[in-house]
Amino acid sequence: MLARCKSMFERDKNHPSIIIWSLGNESFGGENFRKMYRFFKDNDKSRIVHYEGIFHHRMYEDVSEIESQMYTRPWEIEEYAKNNPKKPHIMCEYTHSMGNSNGNLDAYYKLFRKYDVLQGGFVWDFKDQAILKKEGDISYLAYGGDFGDFPNDYDFSGNGLVFANGEVTPKFYEIKYWYADVLFEDVKEGLVKIKNDYLFNNLNRYDIFITTTKNGEFVDEKCVTIDLEPGQTYELEYDVVQKRYKGEEYIVTFTVKEKNETIYAPKGHEVKHHQVVLKPNTLKIEREENTNKVNINEEDKLITLSTEKVKVSLSKESGLLAQYIVNGENILKEESRPYFWRASTNNDRGFKNEVDAVTWRNPNMNLVNIKIENYINLVNLVVDIELDNNSTVTYVYSLDSNSKLKVQQILNPNRDLAKIPAISDMFILKEEFKNITYYGRGEIENYWDKYKSAKVGLYEDIVTEKMVNYLQPQENGAKTDVRYLEIKNEKGEGIKISGVPTFEFNISKYHPEDVEIADHFYKLKPLDATVLRIIYKQMGVGGDDSWRALPHPEYILNPNKIYTLTYEIKPI
């Protein structure tokens, strides 16, 4: 070991990029580490020495000048910071970037900036390791087991912020957001505090664009430059729209961009953004006066509510939405259904959620009762359903004379069950309904605990076979903080789904359970349909590690309370 240490030293001692000598990786302790440490200190007074192994073998505390740890939870590193630490704390590995991961970053970065002794960490890791393999006309990125090798580590080589082919993943942008050294803090409406957290850069090298939007539409924009030295703060005033009527949401977005071309990025490259919502979007618009009636038609198998613009039918066997007819066409290919699952992520598998929570994967349903409540200009269908895991679901479908269908899914879970992966309604739409417009966070995927990199805005997209190509297929592509979602065919016909006040959604050409069982995306067969999930919440993606750590408690759906998903559907 000492010979290797000496060889490394001679090879690298004149490289200015080398700032720390490391004694090894996950090798516990021993006298050889003391000898290596002594060699470096005798031969190089300019660099410090690091070794993570002392975390597990404290009798060799003296061989590292850094408290180096791996995958320590945020509350654990804060405990270290509070207890008179003798060494700076650096995680040589943290936020394990395997598959759809890197949630919870806010918890780490608030601590890094609160305690000087907490010096950050190194993401594991930068790039997936996989090998391009060809089988006939198909090329794909292969991992353990794809070459007939056994035993193997399966896809455990896929821990990167960048895919093996060099494509940047959505995780990369979340890391970028938290790494950026331009910090924003809301002081009050019209005033934001900016801190230059760089060590050397003056913020005058950047343009700061201040953009105002109304319900996602552009209103105005201005550009400012501030002269702010490293470590300093500045309070920046910005204009706000004074008259903001009910149903209007104004957002002010601050975007920090490179003023000039740099060695790493072109002119205009975005460094950081910050958004201020001036009015929360409740979407509780005043009802229009309407004397039209809601018609009720009860048949052997269906209960149908109708107005001049829409027909909504519930199955009398299941109590679920069987038809939603717009312009004479039923947009549904199958009955809607409550859905409490997601395609398991690497982290879900790591803490065995796909085993522990399997009772939430397609529980059998038993219709208990359907009650019709007929009011002036409004009809409610109240549906009670029992699940075979001893939980209950109540639906309240309310169609008013303005053709707005309000849906409430009320889940009363069995308190003895495992954590709930997701709370949602699933719709299998006809394939032609694939053009979407949404007002929410986008356009990259975002989740309950991984969303800061995604701006609230107005986005358009088309549902295709494309997905986020994680090395192993899993939950991907969700959007959060969604105010509304429009889904249309080529003729511009379809539906608008509005949150009360917001919802999450996932839309694709694949069923989550098909995604979950596939070991490579190329094996997935797209459906002749559009698969839509309207989601109350799904648990966070986590990422403190990928083998035991759950998402943080605030991002978990525990079965100890009643959950209500509410949204509204109108025809387009």
Located regions from the model:
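Glycine-centered loop/turn motifs
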Residues: 24, 231, 261, 268-270, ...
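Residue-level signal for short segments within beta-strands and strand-turn junctions
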Residues: 125, 212-214, 258, 429, ...
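Beta-strand-rich binding/interaction modules
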Residues: 191-227, 235-238, 247-258
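Beta-strand/loop-rich accessory regions of lumenal/periplasmic or secreted enzymes
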Residues: 241-247, 262, 276-572
